[in-house]
Amino acid sequence: MKYTPHTPDEVREMLSSLGLSSIEELFSDIPEEVKLKRPLNLPSGMSELEVKKHLANLAAKNGSADKYTVFLGAGVYDHYVPAVVNHILLRSEFYTAYTPYQAEMSQGVLQSIFEYQTMICELTGLDITNASMYDGGSALAEAALMAVSQTRRDKVLVLATVHPEYRSVVKTYTWGPEIEVVEVPYKSGTVDLEKLEELIDDKTAAVLVQHPNFFGQLEPVEEISRLIHAQKGLLVVAVDPISLGILKPPAEYGADIAVGDGQALGNGLAFGGPHLGFFAARKDLARRMPGRLVGLTTDKEGNRGFVLTLQAREQHIRREKATSNICSNQALNALAATVYLATVGKKGLKEIALQSLQKAHYAFERLIGEGYEPLFSGPFFKEFVVKVKNEEEITQKLLKHHILAGPGISRFYPELAPALMIAVTEKRTREEIDNLVEVLGGDR
């Protein structure tokens, strides 16, 4: 290999320092049956033109949202991304996910993060926001750890209507610290309030809620807030940022921490990533917040400047005592969210939310009119679930008509199968929705 950096002498020196005599001895823990005992037989090299054609042919095997009508839900949504978003992202000054440690050389990036934080605070109604998390699941898990640290309690309740993948991440994060995670069952598509009240006690650090929940249903968040705060625990809410164009901000119903996935804010579907997680909280929780915080200050000459602040919380300062181990964050994705929100504005976000709501309800009413039965009958935002005969057959039939819907509910809640999730955004037209209904019409 032409660019392997180690010389034979360096390899011998490294092996000697380890008390080894050969590369084979170094890798002796690898079973013989899985070792390749023949040449790798890689194809010969290609020119740049050939590589581009080869990659284009590989990419052409995949479908894209441009070639299909997308009704996919379960956490990733086909919202419109204004052209200006990607135009700004591709500027070389911004094109990195790394944290701008040198404030004197990074004022533009730091200001963009500060603007992002300001917008998320406006959306959620809370006091402080960090520079971003990896995604919605990691943001919710970090919120659980933060609640445990703040309350000095070791039990967290998570509603069974929270995205199953988010719940899985929470369980992974809390396994090491031995935090007890208890799932609260659902009833008719939202939390069973009686069971929740039974489970909340003086050892409960927080209740983790998703609103709208995984099924698209609106949770009774004000009642949940009352129950957890009566025991001096924290309310953690995972929200769809688009829904905040028309729903109450989390602060208004007493959320102490609000998190969510920012994919819908100017980030494409991209086969499930990369995303960003947003994380907002009350001001008094600032020193327990994970991730980076950008603050506004003045330099010695009185000029405005942006800096990373409260850094004593972070892993590059306190290592094992840090509030989290997040390092390189999702700054580029957060910039996309910033440009998106600045572009659509408050009125635009409200219009996007309203159109998503109205079009989802139009699709719902059309399907019910065709004889489909809803899995749940409560109020929903832009996503709902209908019962079907066979999930796989339905999704394959839709695929043949270049329609993507789902996933089937059996993937996450086998006890509710067979049923199909359908999400509708502002991008969908009446004709596209009518076509969906027409294709589904004979498969009730």
Swiss-Prot record:
Molecular function terms from GO: glycine dehydrogenase (decarboxylating) activity
Protein origin, superkingdom: Bacteria
Reaction(s) catalysed (UniProt annotation): N(6)-[(R)-lipoyl]-L-lysyl-[glycine-cleavage complex H protein] + glycine + H(+) = N(6)-[(R)-S(8)-aminomethyldihydrolipoyl]-L-lysyl-[glycine-cleavage complex H protein] + CO2
CDD domains: GDC-P (cd00613)
Enzyme class: oxidoreductase
Pfam families: GDC-P (PF02347)
InterPro entries recorded: GcvPA, GDC-P_N, GDC_P, PyrdxlP-dep_Trfase, PyrdxlP-dep_Trfase_major, PyrdxlP-dep_Trfase_small
NCBIfam families reported for this sequence: PRK00451.1
Family the entry assigns: Belongs to the GcvP family. N-terminal subunit subfamily.
Assembly notes: The glycine cleavage system is composed of four proteins: P, T, L and H. In this organism, the P 'protein' is a heterodimer of two subunits.
Name this polypeptide is given: Probable glycine dehydrogenase (decarboxylating) subunit 1
